């Protein structure tokens, strides 16, 4: 089973697009186990409180494993985990995607309005 790291903006994009995360990820990379960091969860909890919209955080908690890595910033931690474990990162953050590409790490992004796309 492949691991997929979840970035906060990637999760929000999936929720906003109402994408079936399990089916879409399985179509892209096969069976997956979502991986999320404490920093990403904190960002999502702040967003959920500030914007008063459902971000399906219970679903994320139930379906993911909490992981930790090195880095002073959330993006640094995600980048280091992606490289060390060969995990793609679910994100729509342009800066993070650029850093991942430079490091030859894979990205999963929301493509169009209803689909996920793996970029290796």
Regions found by a protein language model. Give the residues of each.
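Domain-level signal for Mg2+-assisted phosphodiester chemistry and nucleotide/NA-binding surfaces
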Residues: 1-62
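Nuclease catalytic cores that cleave nucleic-acid phosphodiester bonds
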Residues: 35-120
């Amino acid at each position: 089973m492949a691991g997929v790291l979840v970035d906060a903006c990637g999760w929000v994009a999936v929720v906003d697009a109402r994408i079936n995360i399990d089916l879409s990820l399985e179509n892209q990379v096969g069976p997956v186990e979502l991986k999320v960091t404490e920093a990403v969860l904190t960002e999502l909890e702040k967003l959920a409180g500030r914007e008063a919209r459902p971000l399906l955080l219970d679903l994320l908690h139930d379906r993911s494993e909490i992981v930790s890595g090195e880095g002073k910033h959330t993006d640094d931690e995600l980048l280091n985990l992606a490289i060390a474990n060969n995990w793609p990162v679910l994100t729509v953050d342009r800066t993070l995607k650029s850093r991942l590409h430079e490091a030859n790490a894979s990205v999963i992004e929301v493509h169009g309005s209803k689909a996920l796309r793996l970029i290796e």
